Amino acid sequence: MYILFTLVLTFVFCKPIHSLQCYNCSHSTMQCTTSTSCTSNLDSCLIAKAGSGVYYRCWKFDDCSFKRISNQLSETQLKYHCCKKNLCNVNKGIENIKRTISDKALLLLALFLVTAWNFPL
């Protein structure tokens, strides 16, 4: 009886472990349709646009930063987005994904110049 009770509790409270599914294409110029199961250490999906191509792959969420992604992909200009749902790295609205550090730096520089121009020393 105790064994049966333990088995029932195990099935009720333990969820099966499924690996994350992500699209997986390198420097694609078209919509990616190939998917893959991510390994346990890659817990998010990445979509990164660089130049005329788009990268789709499994990615470690803690490494979802401009520096890590640009180093790994050997790209100096890119926009990227990491997500944690199955097949979430689709090429919809890629123009709205995170801006790169260089875009933010240009905006900050422009703001500084406007402020300096309006408030002379």
Curated annotation (Swiss-Prot):
<dbReference type="InterPro" id="IPR016054">
    <property type="entry name" value="LY6_UPA_recep-like"/>
</dbReference>
<keyword id="KW-1032">Host cell membrane</keyword>
<feature type="disulfide bond">
    <location>
        <begin position="83"/>
        <end position="88"/>
    </location>
</feature>
<dbReference type="GO" id="GO:0005886">
    <property type="term" value="C:plasma membrane"/>
</dbReference>
<feature type="disulfide bond">
    <location>
        <begin position="25"/>
        <end position="32"/>
    </location>
</feature>
<dbReference type="GO" id="GO:0001971">
    <property type="term" value="P:negative regulation of activation of membrane attack complex"/>
</dbReference>
<dbReference type="InterPro" id="IPR045860">
    <property type="entry name" value="Snake_toxin-like_sf"/>
</dbReference>
<dbReference type="Pfam" id="PF25152">
    <property type="entry name" value="CD59"/>
</dbReference>
<keyword id="KW-0449">Lipoprotein</keyword>
<keyword id="KW-0472">Membrane</keyword>
<feature type="lipid moiety-binding region" description="GPI-anchor amidated asparagine; by host">
    <location>
        <position position="96"/>
    </location>
</feature>
<dbReference type="InterPro" id="IPR018363">
    <property type="entry name" value="CD59_antigen_CS"/>
</dbReference>
<keyword id="KW-1015">Disulfide bond</keyword>
<keyword id="KW-0336">GPI-anchor</keyword>
<dbReference type="GO" id="GO:0020002">
    <property type="term" value="C:host cell plasma membrane"/>
</dbReference>
<keyword id="KW-0325">Glycoprotein</keyword>
<feature type="propeptide" description="Removed in mature form">
    <location>
        <begin position="97"/>
        <end position="121"/>
    </location>
</feature>
<feature type="disulfide bond">
    <location>
        <begin position="38"/>
        <end position="58"/>
    </location>
</feature>
<feature type="glycosylation site" description="N-linked (GlcNAc...) asparagine; by host">
    <location>
        <position position="24"/>
    </location>
</feature>
<dbReference type="GO" id="GO:0001848">
    <property type="term" value="F:complement binding"/>
</dbReference>
<keyword id="KW-0732">Signal</keyword>
<keyword id="KW-1043">Host membrane</keyword>
<protein>
    <recommendedName>
        <fullName>Surface glycoprotein CD59 homolog</fullName>
    </recommendedName>
</protein>
<feature type="signal peptide">
    <location>
        <begin position="1"/>
        <end position="19"/>
    </location>
</feature>
<feature type="domain" description="UPAR/Ly6">
    <location>
        <begin position="20"/>
        <end position="104"/>
    </location>
</feature>
<feature type="disulfide bond">
    <location>
        <begin position="22"/>
        <end position="45"/>
    </location>
</feature>
<dbReference type="GO" id="GO:0098552">
    <property type="term" value="C:side of membrane"/>
</dbReference>
<dbReference type="InterPro" id="IPR056949">
    <property type="entry name" value="CD59"/>
</dbReference>
<feature type="disulfide bond">
    <location>
        <begin position="64"/>
        <end position="82"/>
    </location>
</feature>
